[in-house]
Amino acid sequence: MTTFAYDPSLRDSTVLITGGATGIGACLVETFVAQGARVGFLDIDAGAGAALAQRLAGGHHAPLFVSADLTDIAALTRGIDAVRQHFGPIAVLLNNAANDQRHKVEDTTPESWDDAMAVNLKHQFFAAKDVAADMRQAGGGSIVNFGSVSWMLKMGGMPVYTTAKAAVQGLTRSLARDFGPFNIRVNTLVPGWVMTDKQLRLWVTDAGRADIARGQCLQQLLMPEHIARMALFLASDDSAMCTAQDFVVDGGWV
């Protein structure tokens, strides 16, 4: 695992991560467990989630995995409550879960629109709403919503996904205003094209690598660890006066 700086403000804090079984989410889980945080993570992939939790069980706090379909808000609420009951009030929320499935305008139906909004936007609002009560009682907390550079780059082939991800940044600003009086920070972490196993398997072709080389200022591949580093900053006391902001980690593409 890549070595990260240690931040004592995260040790023993309860951190909730959505979509934590694979990809960027799995890296987030591993990174925050290494910080000594109490990590609970939710994902629909029960097999991958359980395997990750077992692999990291020897840490300062063994992580808790809860299998949940986050498009089902009742299931999301139950999952959050399970983490709360196991570890205590939630201090940090990382709203990572998403699905960038490609789709065409002409193939989009009202049902597929709703499905894409549910997996990319809706759960972020309701998770933030749920944990805000914990944070208010504690005198503060950090919520990190996950966006995407896709809409900034005018990417085609996934219009509902890009719409949802653009909306995430509006949600962040609204929640930052509403939660600010309670010392709850809300920011958006905006990844570029991150080389997860899924991206490498499905879309990172030779042409895709050429696009990266042309688009990014920094000529190296963007990895999940780069996103986790920014998440650590936004979750920790080091970002105590940062809220309502977009933190882009994309190698200089936007």
Where are these regions (language model features)?
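Active-site loop-to-helix junction immediately N-terminal to the catalytic Tyr of the SDR YXXXK motif
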Residues: 108, 154-162, 174
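Short C-terminal tail/terminal secondary-structure segment
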Residues: 2-9, 153, 232, 243-254
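C-terminal substrate-recognition "lid" of short-chain dehydrogenase/reductases
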Residues: 125-128, 220-249
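Alpha-helical segment proximal to the catalytic Tyr-Lys
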Residues: 133, 177-181, 240
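Residue(s) in the substrate-gating loop at a strand-loop-helix junction
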Residues: 148
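Substrate-binding pocket helix/loop in short-chain dehydrogenase/reductase
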Residues: 104-105, 112-117, 199, 212
